[in-house]
């Protein structure tokens, strides 16, 4: 007969779900959560097909993209895009005059300011005066391009100003040539992915010095380059990787089709069906519509992020031999709103820090005031990119961006009080719920403003 040496089978232990147990392997529960999420997504997709049928129609994409449904036979969007070359050339001519001192500092800066203000105002005036000629896509593209040009020319003007100031202050031959925008010439010689190896002995011969950079080739390379910050010497690659280029092209083409399908099949019906509950201030139904819209909208936003910041910008960078491909950081791990805004759009973040935040701090403004100024400029352009194409000036996007300041404080409090994971949850919640709420508000105001309350029932059903 079996008799164990000890009959004891218990010892002091905590349950696995207790914090004190030290157990942290929940891989099975994560798999369970992904499975439930997948099943829920498939159910929503089937519900959409059963309720609305197949709504994807590529012919409608062409109509929307060309603006044929709005009578745009004279293509004002193409005219404005062509005209965008004019302020670029004007900026170069002013800089040439400043470099040889034909134009003095004050008149030159006034000319630059007028040029930039006119650049921003032209789409607003033309779209308002001739609204029937613009498709929504065309107007949005024009506003986007003109906003990018505004930021690029601001950087171009400021960097050349720094170069002029440094040139005038250099009195000793042994001073470092600070007019060169070249970082760390003595870095490692092994450069991956076809990057050019700038050896120190050849660097001086290949670098561009101010004012030799003031020419059409230089400024138009900068205008096309995937960056908002101007430098006299950008890091370059020495070859185009054909396989990498083909992958990015396929991603852009296929991803664009997926985004258009999701818009037509899922987002448009959800937005239209949210109009009446939102107008009647039916909180329960409006909340249900908000949550229903949140999933496809967030999916489109994620795809758009990948298409823009990975596929398209890498595609442009590869074609132009532009070597700095740091277009985004790990924003998905952001523990607070501040970290998110510093991570998800690196070209804009670098521009804001280099050309707005640091100059304001150097002028004696506090860090908080400089941060508010950055959010204010960002809020203005968010509103500009939404209100001008829609011709609906309600400032929802502006207030949403300015609302990031108190939301940032909340997320930092959650991070410090409850840990980084809760701060990250606040970031994701703001992304998932904030965007569809703005979409619903703008669609409601657009219908009321341009169509009228009498037809709200017609535009509130699919």
Predicted features along the sequence, with ranges:
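Membrane-interfacial catalytic/cofactor-binding modules of polytopic membrane enzymes
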Residues: 201-251, 256, 273-387, 391, ...
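Intramembrane catalytic core of multi-pass membrane enzymes that act on lipidic substrates
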Residues: 67-253
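Aromatic/acidic cage segments in peptide-binding pockets
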Residues: 167-171, 400-405
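N-terminal signal-anchor/initial transmembrane insertion module
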Residues: 1-106, 462
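Membrane-interface junctions at the ends of membrane-embedded or membrane-associated helices
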Residues: 414-418
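Transmembrane alpha-helices of multi-pass eukaryotic membrane proteins
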Residues: 24-40, 69-88, 104-120, 133-148, ...
């Amino acid at each position: 007969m079996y008799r164990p040496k000890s009959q004891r089978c218990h010892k002091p232990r905590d349950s696995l779900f207790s914090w004190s147990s030290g157990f942290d392997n929940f891989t099975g529960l994560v798999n369970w959560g992904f499975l439930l999420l997948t099943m829920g997504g498939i159910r929503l997709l089937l519900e959409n097909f059963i309720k609305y049928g197949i709504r994807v129609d590529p012919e409608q994409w062409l109509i929307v993209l060309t603006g044929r449904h709005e009578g745009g036979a004279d293509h004002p969007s193409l005219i404005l895009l062509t005209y965008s070359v004019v302020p670029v050339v004007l900026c170069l001519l002013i800089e040439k005059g400043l470099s040889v001192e034909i134009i003095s500092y004050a008149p030159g800066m006034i000319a630059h300011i007028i040029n930039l203000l006119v650049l921003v105002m032209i789409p607003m005036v033309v779209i308002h005066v001739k609204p029937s000629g613009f498709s929504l896509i065309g107007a949005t593209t024009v506003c986007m391009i003109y906003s990018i040009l505004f930021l690029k020319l601001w950087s171009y003007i400021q960097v050349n100003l720094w170069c002029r100031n440094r040139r005038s202050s250099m009195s000793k031959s042994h001073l470092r040539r600070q007019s060169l925008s070249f970082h760390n010439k003595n870095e490692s010689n092994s450069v991956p992915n076809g990057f050019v190896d700038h050896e120190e002995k050849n660097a001086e011969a290949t670098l561009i010095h101010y004012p030799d950079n003031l020419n059409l080739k230089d400024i138009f390379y900068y205008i096309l380059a995937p960056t908002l910050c101007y430098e006299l010497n950008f890091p370059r690659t020495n070859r185009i990787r054909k396989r990498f280029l083909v992958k990015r092209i396929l991603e852009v083409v296929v991803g664009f089709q997926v985004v258009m399908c999701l818009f037509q099949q899922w987002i448009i019906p959800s937005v239209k069906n949210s109009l009446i509950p939102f107008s009647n201030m039916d909180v329960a139904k409006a909340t249900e519509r908000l949550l229903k819209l949140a999933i496809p909208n967030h999916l489109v936003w994620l795809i758009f992020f990948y298409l823009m910041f990975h596929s398209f910008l890498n595609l442009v960078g590869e074609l132009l031999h532009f070597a700095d491909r740091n277009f985004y950081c790990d924003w998905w791990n952001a523990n607070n709103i501040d970290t998110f805004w510093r991570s998800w759009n690196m070209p804009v973040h670098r521009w804001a820090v280099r050309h707005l935040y640091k100059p304001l701090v150097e002028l004696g403004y506090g860090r908080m005031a400089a941060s508010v100024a950055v959010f204010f400029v960002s809020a203005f352009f968010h509103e500009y990119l939404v209100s001008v194409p829609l011709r609906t000036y309600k400032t929802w996007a502006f207030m949403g961006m300015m609302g990031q300041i108190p939301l940032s404080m909340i997320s930092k409090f959650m991070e410090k009080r409850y840990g980084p994971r809760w701060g990250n949850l606040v970031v994701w919640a703001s992304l998932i719920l904030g965007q569809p709420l703005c979409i619903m508000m703008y669609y409601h105001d657009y219908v009321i403003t341009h169509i009228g309350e009498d037809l709200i029932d017609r535009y509130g059903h699919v």
